[in-house]
Amino acid sequence: MTIKAVVFDAYGTLYDVQSVAAVTDEAFPGYGELISQIWRLKQLEYTWLRSLMGRYEDFSVITRESLVFTLKALGLAFDTAVFERIMEKYVHLDLYPDAKTALAGLKDCKLAILSNGSTDMLNALVRNTGLDTILDATISIDSTKIFKPSP
């Protein structure tokens, strides 16, 4: 059997979600790593809970809500400019160092991302990191309105 297509998750598979720590540490010195870890845990928690409750929200909304929760839980005051600068990093996440090499090794296959990310977030991220020239498709769960994994 010949493999014709390979589908990857985006966040945590091709893209290092912890790469936001540099931006969060710049905004809140000494808190960067902690912010990025709590933020990611809240994102996952919110997607799971929303799926179970049948109350879908776009992943960009979840990402914003998760960051607000994180900053407030840590008692960190923030203004709109700081908040938006941190949020912007989510469409400029770092690729894992071996991601492009791994994808290049699969050049005979159709390649795609299937992700909880919103269509707009994923398209911007893929474009900003140059994967738009490598991937054949970027698939968001937006159309199903339920986050993975889904029972």
PLM region spans:
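Substrate-recognition element of Asp-dependent hydrolases with the DxDx(T/V) motif
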Residues: 80-92, 99-127, 137-143
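Conserved H-loop
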Residues: 77, 132-136
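Active-site neighborhood of HAD-like aspartate-dependent phosphohydrolases
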Residues: 1-41
